[in-house]
Structures are given as C-alpha cells and as structure tokens.
Amino acid sequence: MENVLKNDWGPLLAPEFEKEYYRKLAGFLKEEYSTHVVYPKKEDIFNALEYTSYENTKVVILGQDPYHGPNQAHGLSFSVQPGIKTPPSLLNMYKELRDEYGYDIPNNGYLVKWAEQGVLLLNTVLTVRQGEANSHKGKGWEHFTDRVIELLNEREKPVIFILWGRHAQAKKKLITNTKHHIIESVHPSPLSARRGFFGSKPYSKVNTILANMGEREIDWEIPNL
C-alpha cells in the first residue's frame, strides 16, 4: 500500500505513507486482502485521486465507505462498475438530476465522467470487507482522507464541497478557508432523501458557482452504456 499516486497528489500525500498510522493500516490491509474478500480491488483503492488531480479538483462529493457487494466498488464514491445495478442512493441522485436538468436516468451507475471533469468522488474510508459495511472504519483511512480534505482546504483556488448527511457534514470542521463553498443537505439514501435532498438542487448550485468563477461548468449527464 505504498504511494502509487502518479499525479500531483503523489508528492502532496507522500508524507502520509511514512506515518505510523498508515504503516498500521497497510499491515491491516495486507492481512485483510489475503484472508477475506475486500473491495475495491487493490489497484482501484486510490481511483478517486487518480481520476481527479489536486489541481483539477473543482467539486468534492464526500461518501462514507465503499459498496460491499460483488463488482460494485471501484474507488469512486457513489459510483458502481458498468453492468451493475444502480444502488438506491445513486438512483435518488439521478432523480434529483432529472428534476433539475431533465436528463433521463441512465442505465448504469458509472460516474467516471464526473471524475474526469474535476468532481473528486471521495469516500472517507477507502476499503471494506465483502458484505460488512463499515468493517474498515477506524483503521486509519480517516486520517488519510482528512489530509486530502485539509490539502484542498489549503488551496487558493476555491473548491465546492458537497456534504450529504451527518457523516459528511462532520468534515465541515476541516474546511476553514472561507474561499471555499459548501453545499449540504440530508443524504440521498431512501431513508432520508424526502426530508430535504429532493429539491435541494445541488448540481445547478455547483454550476452557478463555477460560472460565477469563470470556470467550465460540470456536464452532469451520465450516458447510457
């Protein structure tokens, strides 16, 4: 679990890979991957950072931990691999997108198109044991992903943080630079979406902010596969 980051995240996060917490985490993961089924695949763990460089990050959508079913997780929060049924929270995200922009709900949950446009799809925990939600919570990933948020907070160029639900909103304390923007609501989960996610218009809010900054807006439409 060494620093495999090829883009500008590599030098920024290099000190983390040398820290005691990360060494313990790496040892834990080595054991987990050899004795259990763990998601995502090792080579996909850092995909959020690989697809969306530090310099190119415009938006952060913060998730919790990866999907724990077969072939779902591939290192991007909320996203699933092609050919996999769209999970309920993502389906609600698509419904809100349809209500905002009139886009048809796509036949897949593959969000790489967002990541390639500067939407950092970051989970706070980057691995999970099959069938056991939150099984890698408290093992060290939170220190690592907090550092990612802190580094973005230090950036001069504003970032838009989308915080859905209490877990994501707990990270607000790391976002102290007033240049940045925070968009928050309840989580898109079926348990809470009707209590304020639907109608919150996060996607058009993002694009309004980007337009006001003179930045290219995000094309949120996910194509059918």
Swiss-Prot record:
Gene3D superfamilies given in the database record: Uracil-DNA glycosylase-like domain (3.40.470.10)
Gene Ontology CC, one term: cytoplasm
EC numbers: 3.2.2.27
Pfam families on file: UDG
Keyword field: Cytoplasm, DNA damage, DNA repair, Hydrolase
Molecular functions (GO terms): uracil DNA N-glycosylase activity
GO BP field: base-excision repair, AP site formation via deaminated base removal
Active site, per annotation: D65
Top-rank taxon: Bacteria
InterPro entries: UDG_fam1, Ura-DNA_Glyclase_AS, Uracil-DNA_glycosylase-like, Uracil-DNA_glycosylase-like_sf
Catalytic activity: Hydrolyzes single-stranded DNA or mismatched double-stranded DNA and polynucleotides, releasing free uracil
Cellular localisation: Cytoplasm
Top EC category: hydrolase
HAMAP family assigned: UDG
Known function: Excises uracil residues from the DNA which can arise as a result of misincorporation of dUMP residues by DNA polymerase or due to deamination of cytosine.
Family: Belongs to the uracil-DNA glycosylase (UDG) superfamily. UNG family.
Protein name according to UniProt: Uracil-DNA glycosylase
Organism of derivation: Bacillus cereus (strain ATCC 10987 / NRS 248)
Gene that encodes the chain: ung
